[in-house]
Amino acid sequence: GFVAGLHSFMREARLQAQFSHPALLEVYRVWEQNGTAYMAMRYYRGVTLREMLRTNPQIATEQWLCETLDPILLALQELHNEKCYHRDIAPDNILVLPNGRSVLMDFGAARRIIGGMTRALTTVLKPGYAPIEQYSDDGSMQQGAWTDIYAVGGVLYHAMTGKVPVQAISRMMNDPLKPVAAAARGE
């Protein structure tokens, strides 16, 4: 209930506040007061990558994608160096600012790995962007940096083809995912 949600919010906010990278949301302060929790963060004006691709799909040139996603990959490197994994990367969690800078949002699924185990393992996934290990609800499949990199690959596929990738679970047998070149041509 509420208490579990409060603890989850505080865990997310504190984790996010530990990092300082231009492609990560900047958290100024996290605190509990009046029986609830607060997170003061920088205000960002922008549009999600999902919305940008929906309204202007031609924007997704190779150069634009490199300029947009390189900062995200560098931010992920910083997270991964600290054994922290975002686990929810998708076009709706990438904000593109008016100056073209991109920012990775929503640390709700992020977990820090301690001793090979994630704290409070939960099944969190975004169909099309989540690798197969995120479909395991018993924690039997290990997650790591590759989990986030798979999701970035899904974001690239979506940007280049205009289509959400086929879910990882559906790709296990007789993979129906079209190669990006064929899908981009509409084949």
Model-derived regions: residue spans:
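AlphaC helix of the eukaryotic protein kinase fold
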Residues: 1-18
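Conserved short submotifs of the Hanks-type protein kinase catalytic core
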Residues: 34-48, 52
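Activation segment signature within eukaryotic-like protein kinase domains
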Residues: 68-69
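Activation-segment/catalytic-loop signature of the eukaryotic protein kinase fold
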Residues: 30
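Activation-loop N-terminal segment of eukaryotic-like protein kinases
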Residues: 96-100
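C-terminal lobe helix-coil module of Hanks-type protein kinase domains
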Residues: 128-187
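Protein kinase catalytic-loop region centered on the HRD/HxD motif
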Residues: 72-84
